[in-house]
Amino acid sequence: MTSLPIILASSPLRNLTKPCSTSQIPKPIQNSTKQPPIHLLTKTNLSVTISQLIITSPVLASESFDSISSDPSSGKIDLESILVTIDNFFNKYPFFVAGCTFTYLVVYPAVMFYLRKYKPISAMNAFRKLKNESDSQLLDIRDVKTLALLASPNLKFLGKSSVQVPFSENDEEGFLTKVKGSFSDAENTVVCVLDNFDGNSSKVAELLIKNGFKEAYYIRGGARGKNGWLAIQEELLPPPVHMYTAKNVKSSNNNEASVVGTEN
């Protein structure tokens, strides 16, 4: 039978109670790389998670790409998407687009032309207006040399007279002063403007409206142009309002003199 001291000496409890030397204490394993701070790891993991979520979700991905393409801070415009949108709108509403185009190109100019107070007028309609409207007058804006070769229409037959004021683009104020001096009541006067053709007459008609005249019409073709006063007077206008050239005046005077001589 083994004695008690021998048993205690060989017991593991005795070995545990012995203090360990410092050389026998195991050292912790040290990593060769340093660990980053915990808050950096948190931010990195969060950003990676969000990016993965966007990529895996088709709805969020499309919204993100749309926001990038339409981001005003980038300073870029997606012309292709704009053109596609316009094309889709035209294809979806063709009648609306056609109506807007017709209104802009046809209706609007026609309404503006009708509402404005200076308009073109044919020589025949100008004669009718001078005949039927008491407040209408004829303004001849041709220069002095032209008036010497081709006189203004004689309106004594209508109880009126042609007003002759040569127009000069370099002296519009002086021209307006003379015209207003020739018509006592400009606000109630309708003026038919006659030129050699119809180049300056439209400018004068617009100028008169801007300066207080009731209405102003510029005669199409003027005195010498196509369908002008000279062109229609033989067929459509009565002889008292005809325009005569210097040759016609001389020939008419010679004919009268010859008639008087034969009678004597």
From Swiss-Prot:
InterPro entries: Rhodanese-like_dom_sf, STR4-like. The chain crosses the membrane at residues 95-115. Its main location: plastid. Residues 1-60 form a transit peptide. Keywords: Chloroplast, Membrane, Plastid, Transit peptide, Transmembrane, Transmembrane helix. It is found in: Plastid, Chloroplast; Membrane. One of its GO terms (cellular component) is chloroplast thylakoid membrane. The keyword Ligase does not apply. The keyword Mitochondrion does not apply. Residues 132-232 form the Rhodanese domain. It is a single-pass membrane protein. This is Rhodanese-like domain-containing protein 4A, chloroplastic. It comes from Arabidopsis thaliana.
